[in-house]
Amino acid sequence: MTAAATVQRAQFRQLFVLIAVAFIDMIGFMLVLPVLPFYALKLHATPVQVGWIFAAFSIAQLISAPLWGRVSDRYGRRPALLIGLLASAAAYTVFGFADTLWLLFLSRFVQGAGGGTTGVAQAYVADTVRPSDRARALGWLSAATSAGVVVGPILGTFASRLGTQGPGLIAAGLCVLNAIFAWYWLPESRVAQAPGEAQPKRSVWGPALHAFLNPRLPVSRLIWIYGAGMLAFASLNAVLPLYLADEFGVNERSFGYFLTYFGILSLVIRVVLLGPVVDRFGERSTVRIGCVALIVGFLLYPMVGNLWLLAILVMPLVPIGTALLFPSTTSMLSGRVDRRELGVTMGVAQTFGGVARSVAPVLSTKIFQDLGHAWPFVVAAGIVGVVSLLAVRIGPAPEPTPVPVPAPSAPAAAAAATIDTPVA
């Protein structure tokens, strides 16, 4: 076997384990999410209190994402991911036994803090996958979370039959098993620091402020694209159940089918469509194509009066757009920063995304209530239009430097006998 083939196999093994970890993590998340509002109502929560319980996750993730990025840059991706998984396990345990609203709020906050490792996982991909394959690899990582979105609600339905404690305790158990799996099979990916090289020290919030104040810089522009795109997408997520309920009579039971439908669409598109589109058009054009799909999808939502036509012709445009926009943007971002700053840069991108996810539900539902059902979709299309203008001026990436691949751990080496498929 050639040295190049050996490197490729090592890269695939690491990516496979990371994808498995992300998949199981999302299953746990989706086990709990569908029952959360109903659990809160049983504890006599008001609608505003339910909203704060949901917001607690995004607020905690917003605070923790850059911190996790800095931790991963200094101590390694693997420790950050393991701590995040164990924090999620603790949060789900609290959720399972919560008998007051403040405990429910606490469980969501801790869960959000553990979920701030998303940027760490993306940095892990950038560490281990060659630049030409990063967009596809990030697409597979996103596909794993989409698969979790499909499987999680189904398991949650069965878990809820065990009582209110069922979903939380099963999710906690999955997180513990996931942490054990990652401990044995997920090797460290961070590039080793050269002897005598000083560790850069600056405020964790400095890069986020720098990106906010300098949107014309290449890296900052990509972070803004990611954040603005997330603002539009999260706006749809918040207002869609209200829109479908008022326009088509969809209720909380039938809305779950749409959640699964979106998960299946996202999974198929990211696995089947993303790679060929990036190969054919390149990452920059892929971002622009994704923006067009999102704009058309948002504008068509309020124009289609038949639920079946909406589901078949319009709803797929949004998963197509996000599947093309977000992985390609993240891939380009990873190719434009210093290797030692990957974790904190991905954390900054997640910070922008966290702000968007915190603001979007309030913004879109306020517009829905005060201006009418169509306006949230029009505003979302306008936001993506701004993203498109930013995307037009994305320049080419600098020439990549070789990425050293750490030797796989003993368990990962043993897995080579059963994992033979290279990264496509």
What are these regions (language model features)?
Residues 284-329:
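C-terminal transmembrane helical hairpin of 12-TM major facilitator-type secondary transporters
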Residues 44, 76, 97-102, 304-305:
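Helix-breaking motifs and short loop linkers at transmembrane-helix boundaries and internal kinks
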Residues 107-146:
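Cytoplasmic helix-loop-helix junction between adjacent transmembrane helices
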Residues 62-99:
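Conserved MFS/SLC helix-loop-helix module at the cytosolic interface between two early adjacent transmembrane helices
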Residues 141-184:
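Helix-loop-helix hairpin linking two adjacent transmembrane segments in secondary transporters
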Residues 34-47, 239-254:
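Short amphipathic helix-loop junctions that connect adjacent transmembrane helices
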Residues 64-76, 269-283, 368:
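Helix-to-loop junctions at the C-terminal end of transmembrane segments
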Residues 2-12, 187-224, 412-414, 420:
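Juxtamembrane intracellular "pre-TM" segments in multi-pass secondary transporters
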